[in-house]
Structures are given as structure tokens and as C-alpha cells.
Amino acid sequence: MTKPHKALLLLAFFTLLSTILMAQETGDERAEYLYEKEHPLRETRAVWLTTIGGLDWPRIKATDASSRERQKQELIRILDNYKRANINTVIFQTRVRAALLYPSKIEPWELSLTGKPGQSPGYDPLAFCIEECHKRGMELHSWVVCIPIGTQERQRGYGSASLVKKRPELVKTAKGGEMFMIPGKPETADYIASICKEIVENYDVDGISLDYIRYPESTYNFSDENLYPRASSMSKADWKRENITRIVRRVHDVVKAIKPWVKLSSSPIGKYRDTSRYSAGGWNAYNAVWQDPVYWLKENYQDLLFPMMYFQGNNYYPFLYQWAENSYGHPIVPGLGIYFLDPREGRWTLNEVRAEMHTARNSGIGGIAFYRGEFLTNNCKGIYDTTCDEFFPYPALTARMTWMGDTIAPQAPTSIKYEEGILHWQAPTQITQSNHSYLLYNIYGSNTYPVDVTKAENLLAVNLRDTQWQLNARAQKVRHYAVTAIDRLGNESPAVQEEKPVFELPKHINVPQLINRDVKGTKKTTTGKKTKKKKK
């Protein structure tokens, strides 16, 4: 895109935005008109499910069989609420502060599960969450916090199993007793990659999402510049960015070698760099914490980004546009700080969040993410109702991973039939690609035949793992159905179509008017009207 075209597009973007905001403030009905846009068939709809301190989950500590079951049920209720809102991606905090939510050979159990550091809850929460997400057609991305490992006190609680005891050379204590892994050491990249490798080898995760993949903010007075090679041709700033990129690259190489379809993402600072018109106020990814997520996308080290855009006004919209300009064909899914809807956290209004959601969708950059889950499911200022009714009334597919180079669609399913409220079909008879050996299925339905599988409003269910489906209430209202197969990279097959059987009389048969005898001297037609009986 040329500079003049960019300038015109930017001008149009901000003209539209200012019109929306003015109409919103004045209650002008034009705001609703400007918001109107078809619901997309493909859109990442994500929620960060935060486990540190049990912020979103778990509130119940698993100390015995009864509490363990209640902890599981608590998670099921959360996932059910996500499903009702047509969320399709759950970012599940798996590595918290050098402690994990699964049985590991590398790091200890996270204390939030039982209240005691290093203690097993008696089951595998990561495996359980994956299974429950997949039952509901949702992806699970394992959220890995990379650099911070918590306070000295927290680490002491893990004793000899702590990272501090096992790999002290990788850790440095900063201001306030906060401890961090050292980005300047290449072994740090290897260590974080080993965590991701363990997850991907042992679990059917759909993604690995790296969090805090950056240098600590300046308030911690953290420095590893003593490791900067004096003979380096790079500036110190570029050296720091390379240290962070090395971690991203190492994770990419390890994960993709095992399961190429696993989506790699991160949550960078919400402002990439200062724009030509707007300053990031000293807080951006590139210069403040030495992240270069745009480079990661360019090199395909990452499949998508979830930038933490917990801002308003000129701190949000110009930087959203900046991400859109620098996506290199990858989805950018802005993380919205809906926790600011809570009066204890901020003074955001629902309309402000709606404007951000509409603008993100209209920009076509890839989707929307919410931080964090509790504020969504608690319907803070009506955000859950708005999400369900206005933004996500239908399910959605996630983006195709076209940058992986394989865009060949699988063969269509076969032998579709409807029987007593259940839709059945057969898997494709031919496997044309290696990634087609494991397929999921999408269901579409409408009252017109054939079903148009390009329309979001016809999508009934996504990512089914079985070859049959019990029709839900919405599906029972339509007459025609279609099923597609979809592979791990998001390539979707042609549809196989079926018509729901409905009994209809042949058109050449004349049906006489039915007459019911009522009280003496009258007869009642099917319309319920009474007429006098004629005398003989």
C-alpha cells in the first residue's frame, strides 16, 4: 500500500470512528447504523482464563475427593458460560510463576490448585480442561508465563523443586524481591522451550500462548546488560530484542517439529511503536520492553497475536490500526480490558467497550479477546449479554493457517442422514494430506436448500469430534442441513447436504373440510365458527 493510500485509509478510519463516538455520546441512532456489519464466519473469540491466585479459577481448593469434584464442576460452569457466548478459544493459564497446572518432570504444581505449593490436586487440570473445551467445540491454548517467576517468598515455598534451586543461574532478583528469568542467557530460551515441548508432547492443545515474553518494566530496575558482548555489532536495544526473539524462535522450532498445527501466539504490549501522529507515552512493545512481535509475524515464528490493548480513545484506535497494517497476513486479536467495567478497577462504560469491539471487527484483523473471564461471565455492566446477543449470536470458525503453506481442503464427509433428532454422517473416504488424518466437523443449517455454508448465520456447531450430532434447539428450527470436514490448519471441505424429512401430502390430493359435530342443531367447522343446521 502506498503512503497516499495509507493516509486516505487512515483519514477515512478516523472520520468513521469520530462519527461513531459523537453519535454514541449524543444518543444518535446513526451509531447503530454505523455499527452494522455482517457477522463473520471466521473470527477468533478468546478469553483469558486466569489461574494465578484463583482469579478466574479455581476458587475452590482441591484438598480431598469432594472438593476436587467441586473444583472440576466450577470449571465446567465457566466453560458452559463461554460456550453460550460462542467463545471459540480459551487461553488457559498453565504456567503461572515457574509452577504448573499439570504433572511435570520440570516444574512443581501451582499452589492455587490446593493452597499448598507443589501439592497435587489429585487429577490433571490441564487434561481435564482440554477435554471439556473440546467437548464444547472450543480450542484450548496453553498460556505460558515466561519471564517472571514471582517473589522470593513464593519460590521458597516450592523448596528444592523450585526453579531457583534447580537452575539458579537462570534467575535474577530485582527490586521488591521479584524474581525473573534472564533473557540474555541462551539457556533461558532452551528452558522455556522445554516447558512448551512437554505440554505439546503430552497434551492435545490447540495452541501455546506466550505471556510476559519481554523484559521487565523499568520500575523493577532489572538489567542483564552485563551479558552484552562488547564486540557485538548490535546495539544494546537490538541485542535485548534479539534475546526475546530467541525465546520465541526456539519455542517455534521445538513445537512445530512435534505438531506443526499447534498455533503459536503471544500477548505483547498493546502498542507496538509510536505512530506518526500518536505517542505511546513511553509504554510500547518495541522500545520499552524490547519486544518485536511484528518481526515474529513476518518470520512466521508466531501464528497470531493477542496484544493487550487495555486502553481507550487515542491510546486504542490508532494502535489498533497500526497492528492491522503490520499483520503480515496473520490474525491480530486485540485483548480488551473489560475489567475496567468494574467500578473497583475503572470507570469504563459498556458503550466504550462496544465501540472498541465494533471497530476491531470492522477492521477485519482477526477477532476479539477478553481480559479476563470473570468480568465477562459476571455480566459486568451487561458485557456478557451484549456479547451473546449483539456480537456473537452465532458460532464462528477460527482463521485458516494459510502461511503454513498447506491450503488443500479435505474431502467432504459422506452418507449424511437425519434420524429422530440426530444428524449422522460418515468420515471422508480418502485422505489426501497428512494433516487430514485427524478431522473435525462443522454443521450448517437453514430453511433453504442447498444450505449456504458461506453465511455465519447458518453455522450451527463447530469442531465436532464425532460423526453424529444431537440437534440443539436452534438446529431443530431449520429443515436443511450440511456438514463439512475441517483439518487442523483450518482448511474446510465442500459440504455434504441433507434435507430433514417432513411429511407432505401430494399436491393432487384434495382434502375436504373437516367438520366436527357440536351441540344439537349446529355444526362447527375447523375454524371454530358455528352455523345453523338447515331444516329438511
State the predicted function of each range.
Residues 469-492:
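Beta-strand-rich modules
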Residues 230-278, 283-345:
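Glycoside hydrolase catalytic-domain groove-lining segments
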Residues 421-435:
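Conserved aromatic anchor
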Residues 290-316, 330-404:
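Substrate-binding cleft of secreted/luminal carbohydrate-active enzymes
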Residues 100-115, 148-175, 213-232, 277-284:
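Aromatic- and acidic-residue-enriched segments that line the glycan-binding/catalytic groove
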Residues 70-99, 202-206:
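Catalytic domains of carbohydrate-active enzymes, especially glycoside hydrolases
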Residues 486-516:
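Extracellular fibronectin type III
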Residues 42-44, 50-73, 142, 147-202, ...:
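Active-site-adjacent "subsite" loops/lids of carbohydrate-active enzymes
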